[in-house]
Amino acid sequence: MKNKFAALVITLFVLVLAIDNVTTQCLEGCECNQESTGKTCRPKQGSNVSPAVCLAQYCYHGYC
């Protein structure tokens, strides 16, 4: 019984992480770089945000 409960908790934890990754949006002043393989963010034109800050974020098509 303990093994089933542990497996359920781990599965739910992984599911929450997966959902969080899929719905990540770029920070304010950044936009999704659709040309990048990993769908990283980049600064919007005219934004003062540094590229390093935007690159630290990932986004997915449909959420950017």
Swiss-Prot record:
PTM notes: Contains 3 disulfide bonds.
Domain of life: Eukaryota
Cleavable signal peptide: 1-18
Keyword annotations: Disulfide bond, Neurotoxin, Secreted, Signal, Toxin
Tissue specificity remark: Expressed by the venom gland.
UniProt subcellular location: Secreted
GO MF annotations, alphabetized: toxin activity
GO CC terms of this entry: extracellular region
Similarity comment text for this entry: Belongs to the scolopendra neurotoxin 6 family.
Protein name: Putative neurotoxin 5
Species assigned in the record: Scolopendra mutilans (Chinese red-headed centipede)
